[in-house]
Amino acid sequence: MFGFSGSNNGFGNKPAGSTGFSFGQNNNNTNTQPSASGFGFGGSQPNSGTATTGGFGANQATNTFGSNQQSSTGGGLFGNKPALGSLGSSSTTASGTTATGTGLFGQQTAQPQQSTIGGGLFGNKPTTTTGGLFGNSAQNNSTTSGGLFGNKVGSTGSLMGGNSTQNTSNMNAGGLFGAKPQNTTATTGGLFGSKPQGSTTNGGLFGSGTQNNNTLGGGGLFGQSQQPQTNTAPGLGNTVSTQPSFAWSKPSTGSNLQQQQQQQIQVPLQQTQAIAQQQQLSNYPQQIQEQVLKCKESWDPNTTKTKLRAFVYNKVNETEAILYTKPGHVLQEEWDQAMEKKPSPQTIPIQIYGFEGLNQRNQVQTENVAQARIILNHILEKSTQLQQKHELDTASRILKAQSRNVEIEKRILKLGTQLATLKNRGLPLGIAEEKMWSQFQTLLQRSEDPAGLGKTNELWARLAILKERAKNISSQLDSKLMVFNDDTKNQDSMSKGTGEESNDRINKIVEILTNQQRGITYLNEVLEKDAAIVKKYKNKT
């Protein structure tokens, strides 16, 4: 199996003579050893093998890792199949009749065989005879015992899809790591339509992986479909063979067994179903890939199909906003919607993609806000400086300027009055001045009215009369006093008293007259003031 032919025993068996490998050489090895069955690490069974070689169908009895096999085969050009032990299994094939292979084009050869196979290192794999080129039927009966890793009994179909019926009765013992016996009753397809079906297994020491396959149509060489269903037995580490479940997958149930048996009869129908199923299965990964690509494109901001895109607006001048046009990577419909939804004619839409674009937009806004805050801080500092300067310097200067303005106004008024007087000297009066002068003349005439003068004269006359009366009274008093003095000489004191009283009376009269004189002078002053006012009004007009 690994590059040499001959009968070799592994793990303690002594091999008989071995020869080198050749394409046409017959190798005959005869070993006689105690027979061993079942689970063995080198046990061998007596084999007597005769291998005849043909052109392309030479049969060789080859034992690997200590197993001996005996096969008696003969065959045609393409129809022989060597019986090979797998990895240390020893097998003995006893044929009731001569076991012959098929012919060139698959003539039917009845090969009733009964084989008893002992377990090898990795389990026995007794191989039945295969069909011919265009399909032969073969019947095999085998009984196998479990190997180290379990036994496996199987059969293959013919080249173009012949029917092979296998009535297999297996008595299998579990291997060290879990035997994998298979009870198979199936009609297998041909070269382009074969489909392995159905096994029932028992658990091993470390947990055997069990598979029960029930399939409907036979698969081809390039598109076999296998649907493993798990039925695990208890072990130390069971391995479960499962099928990935998708939205389009359909679970295989046990109810499909009858449909399977019915469909196995019609080979062309199986082939068409297999082709359709292959096409469907080949479309599934493509659909998954398309969905994954769609999901990736919808989240990738570098593609135009991404869903993470939106429009933001920048403020510009209205004249500049008219000049902006649609960028090449933006869709026309989205651009039209963004232009319709813009808040004012002074804004333009800008498209951003993904979270990175949004982050950049946020960073730009934060930078602009920071710059605006810096500018506002500068403005605030300048305003505080101006306010301090105004309070300390400008306000005091304003007060000084106001006081200077008051002084200047006074000086201007003085100059104005002086200029007015200078202008009025030797100059003709104006219309306003003539009016004022006429008003003053009227007032002056009123003051010089004879009625007014008569009143003043009357007052003066009354004053004169009063003065005369006062003189008369005083003279009368003096005369009376003289009379009293004559009458009462002796009364000096009395005379003195009367003199004092007369003096007091005179003084009172003088005071009264002086008061009246004061009143007259006051009236004269009032008249003079009124005359001056009238003159001023006349000068102004």
Swiss-Prot record:
Repeat listed as a keyword: yes
Main subcellular localisation: nucleus
Compartment(s): Nucleus, Nuclear pore complex; Nucleus membrane
FG-type repeats, residues: 2-3, 11-12, 56-57, 65-66
GO biological process terms held by the UniProt record: mRNA transport; NLS-bearing protein import into nucleus; nuclear pore organization; nucleocytoplasmic transport; protein import into nucleus; protein localization to nuclear inner membrane
Region feature (Disordered): 1-261
Membrane topology: Peripheral membrane protein
Biased composition (Polar residues): 19-36, 58-72, 105-116, 125-146, 153-172, 228-257
Keywords: Coiled coil, Membrane, mRNA transport, Nuclear pore complex, Nucleus, Protein transport, Repeat, Translocation, Transport
Entry keyword Transport: yes
Start and stop residues of the FXFG repeats: 21-24, 39-42
The protein's assembly and partners: Component of the nuclear pore complex (NPC). NPC constitutes the exclusive means of nucleocytoplasmic transport. NPCs allow the passive diffusion of ions and small molecules and the active, nuclear transport receptor-mediated bidirectional transport of macromolecules such as proteins, RNAs, ribonucleoparticles (RNPs), and ribosomal subunits across the nuclear envelope. Due to its 8-fold rotational symmetry, all subunits are present with 8 copies or multiples thereof. NUP57 is part of the NUP57 subcomplex (NIC96, NSP1, NUP49, NUP57) interacting with NUP49 and NSP1.
Family membership noted in the UniProt record: Belongs to the nucleoporin GLFG family.
Domain notes: Contains FG repeats. FG repeats are interaction sites for karyopherins (importins, exportins) and form probably an affinity gradient, guiding the transport proteins unidirectionally with their cargo through the NPC. FG repeat regions are highly flexible and lack ordered secondary structure. The overall conservation of FG repeats regarding exact sequence, spacing, and repeat unit length is limited.
Summary of the function given for this chain in its UniProt record: Functions as a component of the nuclear pore complex (NPC). NPC components, collectively referred to as nucleoporins (NUPs), can play the role of both NPC structural components and of docking or interaction partners for transiently associated nuclear transport factors. Active directional transport is assured by both, a Phe-Gly (FG) repeat affinity gradient for these transport factors across the NPC and a transport cofactor concentration gradient across the nuclear envelope (GSP1 and GSP2 GTPases associated predominantly with GTP in the nucleus, with GDP in the cytoplasm).
Miscellaneous notes: Present with 9310 molecules/cell in log phase SD medium.
Name of the protein in question: Nucleoporin NUP57
Organism: Saccharomyces cerevisiae (strain ATCC 204508 / S288c) (Baker's yeast)
